[in-house]
Amino acid sequence: GSIAFKGDTLSKITPNIIAQMGISRTFQNLALFKRMSAIDNILVGRKLHSKANFMDVALQLPKARKEEKVNLKKCEEIVEFLEIEKIKDTPVGKLPYGLQKRVELGRALATEASLLLLDEPMAGMNVEEKREMCRFILEVNEEYGTTMVLIEHDMGVVMDISDRVVVLDYGKIIGDGPPEEVRANQNVIDAYLGVSHGE
C-alpha cells in the first residue's frame, strides 16, 4: 500500500522532506539522546525551523542568537505544557520511562507539525503514566489543533481518546469508524478475542 498526506504520496519522500511537510512522530522504542538534557532533546525538534547556518552559529552572529532565543522560548512553553519543568535540565537517560516518553512527545511538538504520528505512545507504561499521557494527547489536540494518528494496542486507551478508530488484522482493515461503532463490530471482537482465521 501507500500513504498519502495532503495529496502527496510519502513512500518515496525522504524523512527530512516529510518533516518539512508538517509531519512529526514519536517512536515505539525511545529515540532520545540519553546524555542530553530534556530541554536539549526538545530543542532538537526546532532544527527544522533553523535558518542560521553553521558559521552564523559558530560566530554567534545576531541572526543565530535571535533564532536561539525564539527556539528556547518555544521549548520552554512546551516544557511547561508537559509539566516537566523540574526535570528539564536532567539528562534523559536518568529519567523514568514515562517522563522520557513525555520528552519525546515534546520534541515532536517542537516541530510544530500539523500531523503527529504516535507509535505506541503507551507501550511499557504503568496505569498512572498512561493516564497522564492520554491527558497530554487530548490537550495537544485541543491546545494546538494538531491531528494525531495513534498506533496503540491498548484498546481501552484507543476507545477512550479517539474520534475515529481503524482496526487492522494482518494488514486488512476490519473496522473503521467512531469508537462506539468499532467496539460493537463483530470482526473486531473476533480478532481481539482470538477467533481463529480458519473459522
Which positions does each model-derived feature cover?
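Glycine-rich phosphate-binding loops of nucleotide-dependent enzymes
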Residues: 1-199
